[in-house]
Amino acid sequence: MKLILFDFDGVLADTEKACYQIHTIKNKDLTWKRFQEYSLGNFFEGYDKAVEEGKHIPADDFLGSYKKILDFLTIHEILHESVLSLATDYRLAIISSANTSYINDFLVKEGLSECFSDVLGADIHRSKTFKIKTILTKYHIMPKDTVFVTDTLGDIKEAEKCCVSSIGVTWGLHDRSILEKGKPLKIIDDPQDLVKVIRKI
């Protein structure tokens, strides 16, 4: 294994419940299950479809509210140590639907900015498949030497389009039963198992 790709929200940053709450301000009937369904495929495709069909009202200044969440959020200590450990032996990058500059600011705040060679957010491209291919091409790394750590079925599907395998984590948006549908290499329930699982692949 040469390259470890990380999703951000729900994997490195515990933001998914807060993001859900932001959306419920204008969507009182938005259930957690329906919010999860936006990420069964590409998040933006699911979200945009709901907006176009009149089933979802966009939040006022979502990015501003999201930035405030990151300003006060701290990465879990075990995940912090995991990133530091993995960065000594692998190239690490973040593939996210969040804003690139917000993620970079968070990494600086948490003392992890030097651990990631690249951060590709939604402002780079809305497709994670596109962003994964971009990283593979940039560093001439084969898909078989890459793994994507994510909390959503949609991400697993997008990585699969690049022939990149995934590791699902259950401390984010989707639970084990949903992640299993994408047939990831492994599903991890406890952050302290992350490094061990990756090093065994």
Locate predicted features.
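Conserved Lys-Pro-Asp/Glu-containing loop-to-beta segment of HAD-superfamily phosphomonoesterases
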Residues: 3, 129-158
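N-terminal helical cap/lid subdomain that shapes the substrate entry/recognition surface
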Residues: 2-80
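Acidic, Mg2+-coordinating phosphoryl-transfer loop and its flanking beta/alpha structural elements
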Residues: 148-188
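Short acidic-hydrophobic, aromatic-tinged amphipathic segments that line or gate anion-handling sites
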Residues: 120-121, 186-190
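Short, acidic loop-to-helix structural element flanking the phosphoryl-transfer center
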Residues: 67-94, 100, 104, 130
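Non-catalytic pre-domain segments flanking phosphatase-related domains
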Residues: 1-6, 192, 201
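Glycine-rich phosphate-binding loop signature in dinucleotide/nucleotide-binding domains
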Residues: 88-90, 139-145, 201
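A short, structured active-site edge motif that brings together acidic residues
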Residues: 35, 113-127
